Amino acid sequence: MATVKWSFSSLKDFINCPKQYHEVKVKQNFVKKVTEQMLYGTEVHKALEDYVRDGTPLAKNYQRFQPMLDVLRATPGQHYPEHKMALNAGKTPCDFDSVDYWVRGIVDLLVVNGSQAYIIDYKTGSNKYPDPKQLKLMALMTFAHFPDVEYIKGGLLFVAHNSFVAEEYERDAVP
């Protein structure tokens, strides 16, 4: 039996509607419709990535996010915007595009500073029901990819609401 390959977003799609997931992802009978909200989210993510990575000026309608982003840019350590990580079925690191990957994901911003790391996931939607499970998955992959990291502070940054949902993870707590 073939190993099921997954990401957090594909798992959410499956949980939301298994039949739709099967029709779109497995059978490929339909293409997932791109909504205005999805386009907006992609555009904002790209603007935030470019600003945090190399200081590309933000468009006027995104300049209100700059104070939050300046804090991230000033965080000590090696910055990895849009950092791709993957694990194989043995839960060891592999290349994101490896044929052997089992799970993979992209961290919006990863900052590694010695034994401590920061994981930031930009969110453009509502902060009413935050779901930090994606942070937990990214933390597990970060521990696997960065063996010196012992402690991770993670957060969902709801940029449109100037809201931050924080999480903390310790390597010792990983089973």
PLM regions with names:
Residues 43, 133-141:
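Short amphipathic alpha-helical face segments that pack within enzyme cores
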Residues 4-56, 82-83:
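Nuclease catalytic cores
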Residues 34, 38, 139-144:
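Conserved catalytic core of nucleotide polymerization and phosphodiester-bond processing enzymes
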